[in-house]
Amino acid sequence: MAVLLGGPSLAQTPGGSAIESDSRPPADWALSFNLAGYVVPNTQSYASPTFSADKRKFHFGARYNYEDQHTGSVWLGYNFEAGDKLLFQATPMIGGVFGRTTGIAPGYLASLSWKKLELSSEGEFVFDTEERSGSFFYSWMEFSYSPVEWFRAGLVADRTKAYKTSLDIQRGVLIGLSHRRVDFTTYIFNAGWTTPTMVLSLGFSF
């Protein structure tokens, strides 16, 4: 699959915010690594690692088991932001996808933050270069509230082809904890609609 969450790290993988704030000196790299474990009913569980690196306005990313299982992708994007109290951050991207699914993918990361609230989203459309019917729009969206710096809770929605349930859009709740440069988020999808899917996400930033 995909997280951003945050998880939402610059790549909105599960467990992090959609965009890494640019608080470092311009010459420094901002790095993040996230590992999300998917516990899906009636199928084999799997892990999805993602990595991102940002320098100044440029964003680089790599993902595995994200757009699809046994599939990798690499990304190049450009970061920008606007606002102060109401902060908007976005990264338009272009990616190459290879493996079980192969194609080209324009995508984006975006977040809107105000006080203790954050709305974050990421999406991509994979143009399957081997089979047109395999083209797919992926989306991950979170809305969260952080009463204190180290805790957040909220809602999440996901559309993916990395795993399947009886629902086209997976929906659920999230609870996240963070300490310094480490964060851990639990996502529970589809409780009350079908057998729940759980995602456990551990992220590091450097």
Predicted regions, residues:
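Outer-membrane beta-barrel transmembrane domain signature
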Residues: 16-22, 27, 32-34, 39-44, ...
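Glycine/small-residue-rich loop that forms an oxyanion/phosphate-binding "nest" at active or ligand-binding sites
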Residues: 72-96
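Bacterial N-terminal signal peptides
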Residues: 1-7
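Boundary at the C-terminal end of the N-terminal hydrophobic targeting segment
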Residues: 9-13
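N-terminal carbohydrate-binding/catalytic regions of secreted carbohydrate-active enzymes
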Residues: 61-62
